[in-house]
């Protein structure tokens, strides 16, 4: 599933292609996604101008020149947004086609259909946005804040930093990498982390996310940026997906670990 850097990459790629463009038509080709597509609600976008594209956690928000409605998008497991010439042949899993006034169209493509593409009332937060935690790249997201969340919590630290109600946008890839670079076992109870360890972990999270955004996100099987190019941060990954290989720090063998039904990778020697 795309994590924060992938969604941020998508946002940055879409902005110059969509902002100030007018929507001339909306074609809903398959109504069944995570939540059914509402063709009538989406038709309200016709004749509207796209004014801005923002991100909250792993969600994209497409704002238009109406104050009452906006579009909320989640890419799910395999979703992508592409801006293509209107003459480009329509693909099987192009579920929504938004025609623009410049000869191009925005297409939502999602083979697994776990994504979300919905119109919502912009004057109040969508229910999926109401209880989200702090953005990890905000200045207010510090090691001290993380340490406060760890207090008296027996939950594994790997699960805590992926809890979207605490810190948003961090998935298994960046959690695995940040814990390795911080020397912290992913299965340690959060309450056992010191303030210094939390500071180190948060610093690594920020560094990893910033670097991944700069490089266009992590190459996942189903992720690509709006221009169709895959991200290439995977070349920089240290341990994620490398169980059974040698640790890049100490040379010992990296091991798998199952936490809350999610697989992670760590070095038993380097991570304590």
From Swiss-Prot:
Signal peptide range: none
Single biological process term from Gene Ontology: base-excision repair
Function: Involved in base excision repair of DNA damaged by oxidation or by mutagenic agents. Acts as a DNA glycosylase that recognizes and removes damaged bases. Has a preference for oxidized purines, such as 7,8-dihydro-8-oxoguanine (8-oxoG). Has AP (apurinic/apyrimidinic) lyase activity and introduces nicks in the DNA strand. Cleaves the DNA backbone by beta-delta elimination to generate a single-strand break at the site of the removed base with both 3'- and 5'-phosphates.
Superkingdom: Bacteria
Manner of cofactor binding, per the entry note: Binds 1 zinc ion per subunit.
Gene3D superfamilies, alphabetized: 1.10.8.50, MutM-like, N-terminal (3.20.190.10)
InterPro entries associated with the record: DNA_glyclase/AP_lyase_DNA-bd, DNA_glyclase_Znf_dom_DNA_BS, Formamido-pyr_DNA_Glyclase, FPG_cat, MutM-like_N-ter, Ribosomal_uS13-like_H2TH, Znf_DNA_glyclase/AP_lyase, Znf_FPG/IleRS
Active-site annotation: 2 (schiff-base intermediate with dna), 3 (proton donor), 58 (proton donor), 262 (proton donor)
PROSITE patterns registered for this protein in UniProt: FPG_CAT, ZF_FPG_1, ZF_FPG_2
Protein's recorded name: Formamidopyrimidine-DNA glycosylase
EC assignment: 3.2.2.23, 4.2.99.18
Family: Belongs to the FPG family.
GO molecular-function terms, A-Z: 8-oxo-7,8-dihydroguanine DNA N-glycosylase activity; class I DNA-(apurinic or apyrimidinic site) endonuclease activity; damaged DNA binding; zinc ion binding
Species in which this protein is naturally found: Dichelobacter nodosus (strain VCS1703A)
Cofactor(s) the record lists: Zn(2+)
Residues at which DNA binds: 93, 112, 153
Subunit structure as annotated in this protein's UniProt entry: Monomer.
FPG-type zinc finger segments: 238-272
The reaction(s) this protein catalyses: Hydrolysis of DNA containing ring-opened 7-methylguanine residues, releasing 2,6-diamino-4-hydroxy-5-(N-methyl)formamidopyrimidine; 2'-deoxyribonucleotide-(2'-deoxyribose 5'-phosphate)-2'-deoxyribonucleotide-DNA = a 3'-end 2'-deoxyribonucleotide-(2,3-dehydro-2,3-deoxyribose 5'-phosphate)-DNA + a 5'-end 5'-phospho-2'-deoxyribonucleoside-DNA + H(+)
UniProt keyword Ubl conjugation, yes or no: no
């Amino acid at each position: 599933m795309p994590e924060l850097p992938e969604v941020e990459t998508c946002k940055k790629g879409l902005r110059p292609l969509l902002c100030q463009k007018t929507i001339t038509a909306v074609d809903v080709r398959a109504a069944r996604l995570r939540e059914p597509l509402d063709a009538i609600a989406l038709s309200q976008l016709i004749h509207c101008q796209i004014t801005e594209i923002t991100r909250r956690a792993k969600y994209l928000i497409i704002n238009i020149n109406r104050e009452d409605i906006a579009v909320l998008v989640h890419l799910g497991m395999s979703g992508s947004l592409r801006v293509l010439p209107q003459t480009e042949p329509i693909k099987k899993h192009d579920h929504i086609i938004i025609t623009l006034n410049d000869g191009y169209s925005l297409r939502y493509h999602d083979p697994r259909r776990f994504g979300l593409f919905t119109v919502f009332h912009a004057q109040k937060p969508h229910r999926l946005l109401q209880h989200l935690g702090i953005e990890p790249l905000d200045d207010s997201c510090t090691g001290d804040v993380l340490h406060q969340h760890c207090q008296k919590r027996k939950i594994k630290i790997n699960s805590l930093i992926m809890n979207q109600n605490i810190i948003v946008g961090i998935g298994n890839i960046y959690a695995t990498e940040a814990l390795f670079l911080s020397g912290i076992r992913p299965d340690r109870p959060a309450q056992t982390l010191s303030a210094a360890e939390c500071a180190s972990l948060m610093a690594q999270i920020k560094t990893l996310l910033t670097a991944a955004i700069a490089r266009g996100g992590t190459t996942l099987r189903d992720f690509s940026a709006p221009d169709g190019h895959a991200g290439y941060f995977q070349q920089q990954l240290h341990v994620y997906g490398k169980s059974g290989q040698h640790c890049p720090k100490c040379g010992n063998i990296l091991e798998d670990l199952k936490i809350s039904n999610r697989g992670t990778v760590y070095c038993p020697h380097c991570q304590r």
